[in-house]
């Protein structure tokens, strides 16, 4: 995929702020600090369009990135150990649920999990949520460069088993450092962007 243009269009907190262009959208979900911003930057060959942070829970809005004027990456708030109040977390949860269950232009979701560790309960719940609402899901196992090559498949197998990955759902090993998995991720995404 040749990316010629990428821009952050809006950081939205409520549905009336979502773009209404009708372009297809792919949501990125995952724990705080799993590497969603780094994933976006690597996929579109930019250093810092999506701002990365060492402080978990930085993304508190739905960030709509318009790519090539043709589709959106939507970065949703990270779940897990974001340092916010329970009330804030519930507010985010509601915002995410509203987006995932009512957004007609949402074509697929990318669930990012950390390849170094088995998926968390939150990861499993998120995967089951997507399956329940029949949102096509592609699992991206990030930080693959931190796992020795010889052990990557073993870690991938643990991830598949923990998530109880459905037949036909992809799990792609990805590294924003080396670019491993980038072509594969685009290949998995393209069918949803060209419907």
Swiss-Prot record:
Mg(2+) binds at residues 37, 59. Its cofactor is Mg(2+). SUPFAM superfamilies: P-loop containing nucleoside triphosphate hydrolases (SSF52540). The keyword Ribosomal protein does not apply. One of its GO terms (biological process) is division septum assembly. It comes from the Bacteria. InterPro entries: G_ENGB_dom, GTP-bd, GTP-bd_ribosome_bio_YsxC, P-loop_NTPase. GO terms for cellular component: cytosol. The keyword GTP-binding applies. Belongs to the TRAFAC class TrmE-Era-EngA-EngB-Septin-like GTPase superfamily. EngB GTPase family. Necessary for normal cell division and for the maintenance of normal septation. This is Probable GTP-binding protein EngB. It comes from Geobacillus thermodenitrificans (strain NG80-2).
